[in-house]
């Protein structure tokens, strides 16, 4: 893995505003940082990133399967009771997800580890489609 430093787009703020990405800077700090990229070997991608990501996604789906079957778990996760049936019905119909983004930590020497998984969240539309 090799870290590559890049210049920020000179018109970043204007481009962000043009697509409604008004939170590119939050609390005086940049939320969106495009000054770093990473170059990987094929083995790193296949073995350390793609393989673990596939396994993690399967684990998340297993967890969701368990959660939607148990109203107490949905409540524990802060899901309003009024939404329980909607979520369970959507899951039972296998409605497709729009997108998902895994935030992984990877040191270049072993399998990536999951920090968080954002799927079908409003901000991800900007982060993974409109603004990239």
Feature-to-residue mapping (PLM):
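Preference for protein termini
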Residues: 1-132
């Amino acid at each position: 893995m090799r870290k590559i430093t890049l210049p920020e787009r000179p018109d970043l703020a204007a481009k962000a505003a043009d697509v409604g990405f008004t939170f590119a800077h939050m609390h005086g700090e940049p939320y969106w940082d495009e000054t770093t990229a990473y170059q990987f070997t094929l083995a790193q991608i296949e073995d350390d990133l793609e393989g673990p990501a596939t396994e993690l996604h399967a684990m998340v789906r297993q967890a969701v399967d368990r959660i939607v079957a148990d109203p107490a778990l949905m409540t524990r996760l802060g899901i309003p009771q009024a939404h329980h049936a909607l979520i369970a019905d959507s899951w039972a119909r296998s409605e497709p997800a729009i997108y998902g983004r895994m935030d992984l930590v990877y040191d270049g020497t072993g399998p990536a580890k999951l920090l968080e998984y954002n799927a079908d969240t409003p901000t991800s539309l900007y982060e993974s489609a409109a603004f990239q």
